[in-house]
Every structure is written in structure tokens, then in C-alpha cells.
Amino acid sequence: LRVDLLEEVRRALGEERHPRVSSLRAVTDCVLETLTQVEAAAAAASGVPVLLTCRTAAEGGRASLGDAGYAVLMRLLLDELASWEPRRRPVAVDIEVRRGCLPEVAARARDLGVDVVGSFHDFEGTPADADLEEVLDRMVREGGDLAKIAVWPASAEDVARLLGVTARAAASLPVPVAAMSMGALGMISRVAAVFGSALTFAVVPDEEGCIEASAPGQLPIDEVRRCLSLLGGRPIG
């Protein structure tokens, strides 16, 4: 279960009045309040692991936070989680590697028994293979327990390159790797577990059956289960 704190903050503050959350104070105050709702959601999920994310505008979210503000937010988040019972904490927190705070956050999270997902997003294109491999290596060096990349393809060749990078990284890195090519063109990468991607993201319909993807190209969870069953890969629980 993925919970994006900054998306919850947007809803709490009111989308019409605050189309882009830019005040760090408003964000942090609301995050601390929202965490109590996250704890309740985790309890209601009956043992389903919770991944906590704080996705800003640069990573496809809505909040406008600079690197310093992002680091402060993550420190506050972990300080708050320290007061929770270990069994109620999220199993992992997602940190954008380009923010520069991954080593600090990874060390603090490790003390709390919370895993760290190192993330890299590129909504403009698919970097060269060597650049993607360096990003994955950096996540490992800086303490990530899982290295995840999401990129935008301009062609089928870009998708194929990403799958190749994924396969090589999965075979050589000491931590699991997750990689996805966004948009309709990259959908195959979200269900092609045979190339080594350790996890994928799927959309769960709301009570009215409506589907709202958090990133372009995400598929409904039932379709993802069906694809994983056909193509190989452990179905989502």
C-alpha cells in the first residue's frame, strides 16, 4: 500500500485554495496531522506493507519544495515515526536520490527498522544506459535498500534499453531493483518482472470503482495480477 503524504496534504489543505503547496510550514504541520491517518490506514490494511512517499512537483507530485525543505520534511517525518510502535510503522520510506539527503535519511531510517527506497524520476526522457546505471549504483552507495527508477520513453527502443539496464542491475547489485518506463508506451515494463524488476505499482479502484493513477501508465491492480500470472512474476497479494 503506497501512501503519498504530500498528496494527502493537498487534499487536507484544499485543492482549490492551494493548487500548489509551497509553504514548508504548512506542509510539515499538515504532514504530522496526516501521519495519524496513515497509522490508521496501516492498521486497517491487515498486514499489507505500507510504503510512505513524499512526492514533490519535481517527481510528478504537487508540492513545491526545494532540496533543503525536502530534507527538513524527511527529518521531521522520521522523528515522528520514532514515537510509533515498531509494528505500526511503514515498512519503507521513499527518498528521491537527487535531493541529496539519502545517506542521512537511510541512516536514521535504519535505526527505526524502516527500509529506504531510493528513487529517481525523469519525466523528460530516458537517460543513457551508463547514466541510469550510475544512478542505481549511487542509491546503493548512499544506503538504499531498494533502487527504483522511473523514466519517460520517446520510443520503443527507450523501453527496451530500460529493460536491459534493469536486467543487468538486478544481476549485479546487492539490493533489489525496480524500474519502470512511464506512459502508455512503457506499460510493458510495469509487468515484465522477468527482466528483474522487484516491484511494480498498480491502481486500486475507489469505492465507486473510479481509478486515479499516481503516475502515467499505471494499470488497475486486477490487470497487473493477470499480466504477472501470464508473464511471470509473483502476483500482488
Give the label of every model feature segment.
Residues 35, 39-45, 93, 166, ...:
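Structural signal for hydrophobic packing residues in well-ordered secondary-structure cores
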Residues 1-60, 67:
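Conserved N-terminal beta1-alpha1 strand-loop-helix module at the mouth
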Residues 31-47, 75-88, 104-113, 139-141:
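Acidic (Asp/Glu)-rich catalytic clusters
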Residues 50, 55-77, 184-197, 202-209:
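Cofactor- and metal-binding active-site motifs of prokaryotic enzymes
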Residues 2-4, 20-33, 53-55, 70-101, ...:
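Catalytic beta/alpha-barrel core
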Residues 98-237:
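Catalytic alpha/beta core domains of metabolic enzymes, predominantly
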